[in-house]
Amino acid sequence: MGLLEGTFLDWEYESYPSYEDFAVLPLFALFFPSVRFLLDRFVFEKVARRLIFGKGQEVVENETDDRRRRIRKFKESAWKCIYFLSAEVFALVVTYNEPWFTNTRYFWVGPGDQVWPDQMYKSKLKALYMYTGGFYTYSIFALIFWETRRSDFGVSMSHHVATAILIVLSYNIRFARVGSVVLAIHDASDIFLEIGKMSKYSGAEALASFRYLCLSWIILRLIYYPFWVLWSTSYEVLQTLDKEKHKVDGPIYYYIFNSLLFCLLVLHIYWWVLIYRMLVKQIQARGQLSDDVRSDSEDEHED
């Protein structure tokens, strides 16, 4: 049964995942650029000019290319911060009262006699997936046609594509429970990342110490993600899988999904190296940042 059916309004209703559910994904993919355009024009532009130039200097004659770039990049980070905050709240609303929020074993068993991969999803979990899937579908195109071209463009594109594939695959192969926790892990640290970047663009270096970013990145992406989430998807799931019933599809689901999850771990480590370098530079400069976060410098080929 697809998400467009009436039962979608009942968030606790359980049903098996279906390709029909993805009928709403294009709606979200169109929703995000529409909202971003309105926020860019009526909110972010004014806020950026106020914070970057100061009160009474929002309109500057003979505006330089550097100032225009700072405004554009500030608006990009403001938009991402708004999305990640909304997605984090959504993910917590969906997962907080579920048994697998605190016990990874319930990724694979329950409720009742349901055992992975024969598990149903609640409508609220399906909605979270379509919301996030729509954003990353839009983000792939935004990175090409809308965003400032940065030196880590290839890595960012790989991340967006891998995330979009993970969302589609994990949904259809019944990995959505663990997937919702992975989404919550990523969104939490990304909120602090975008706040730090906005503070850099606005010249508020004291706010750009990235202490919360570093702390959340270490705890969520470098400790909890590999030692709890990946441990559960690599080992714990094997203890519950009916190997006789799922001789073919079980191993296929297992290896494909875990390969993508480990690719995300590699990206976590890569970005942590960049964040760590920035942290060291900030300490040496006594709180001042000479560069930006996570390879945020412009591509040398940008006009």
Curated annotation (Swiss-Prot):
Entry GO CC: endoplasmic reticulum; endoplasmic reticulum membrane
Q: Alphabetically list the UniProt keywords.
A: Endoplasmic reticulum, Lipid biosynthesis, Lipid metabolism, Membrane, Transmembrane, Transmembrane helix
**InterPro entries from the UniProt entry:** Lag1/Lac1-like (IPR016439), TLC-dom (IPR006634)
* GO biological process terms on file: ceramide biosynthetic process
Ranges annotated as spanning the membrane: 19-39, 81-101, 127-147, 153-173, 212-232, 255-275
Q: Which residues form the TLC domain?
A: 72-284
For this protein, the record's SMART domains field holds: TLC
- Where, per UniProt, does this protein localize? Endoplasmic reticulum membrane
Q: What function does this protein fulfil?
A: Mediates resistance to sphinganine-analog mycotoxins (SAMs) by restoring the sphingolipid biosynthesis. Could salvage the transport of GPI-anchored proteins from the endoplasmic reticulum to the Golgi apparatus in ceramides-depleted cells after SAM exposure.
The name on file for this protein is ASC1-like protein
State the organism named in the record: Solanum lycopersicum
| Taxonomic classification | Eukaryota, Viridiplantae, Streptophyta, Embryophyta, Tracheophyta
